[in-house]
């Protein structure tokens, strides 16, 4: 039997206070992104199956195993993962400061490679920065790790 322990994640209030009701699968996707970004901030090496690349605009493209977003007891529910990515793609975060106004999808261009069981998607630099913006405070989340 696998030992279960808790892993602490910090979630920016900017993300926490977004005016959306996220589904369980959408939350799972967002929490995994927060977890990955937190590991990078802490200087930890990512799982070898995770691939992140920034383009010249510093938007980040993630390639991750689909299993990362599935429940342990439901490893074949790709339909729900696709639905959650589509939904996050249609959710807009509006950003404005003294220099810039932007209307951005939380996630862009999700693509599943069925042979490799991976999903690739892009997050705009401004959205990715929201995951790391603790200037308005943060919320501590506990993730159960097996």
Where are these regions (language model features)?
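Charged, alpha-helix-forming regions
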Residues: 1-146
